[in-house]
Amino acid sequence: MVRATGLHPVGHRFESCVVHHSFYFYPMRHVISVLVENKFGVLARIAGLFSGRGFNIDTLNVGPTHEDGRSRITVTLNGDEKALDQCIKQLDKLIDVIRVENFVGEEGVGRELVLVKVNADSQTRAEITQICDVFRGKIIDVAPNSLIIEATGNENKIKAFLNLLDSFGISELARTGTVSLRRGSQNI
């Protein structure tokens, strides 16, 4: 079964779609959390497994956990659920992989960080500051013709924030990609 994230009537052309009963279904967005031993080559093997099966990794985030010698890898991608389930089973068999989770829907809480350098002069600073306040962004550097702003949130919040700042001129941008944890008392 293919889950839809967007439906479009037949007659419109879209890339990477699956046709089913006169509608196009976009592949579902997946957030995969992988707990691993922090060893040489683990990340390369995991990324290779995804790319070898035709998945394009949209975001990739790696960092140590609170346990010594362990790291969490968070991967976001779009893809067919059946093919991804097979890939996850193969991931789970890799030697240094401790556990793999595919967060579907509201099972996980995800956030990303963005640093954005925006063109700002004396006439636009107040408006940019108001946008920052609405999105709970933080101005972390002020220069004569620019501001560097930090913001965190889910992917949709970050997109909306960047859309508003785009009219001022974004000169540089760095995003972390999603990091995610499972909701509730169960841990990965």
Stretches found by the model and what they are:
Residues 28-72, 76-188:
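Long, contiguous binding/interaction regions
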Residues 1, 27-28:
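Initiator methionine at the very start of the polypeptide chain
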Residues 13-27:
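Short, Lys/Arg-enriched N-terminal segments with co-localized hydrophobic residues
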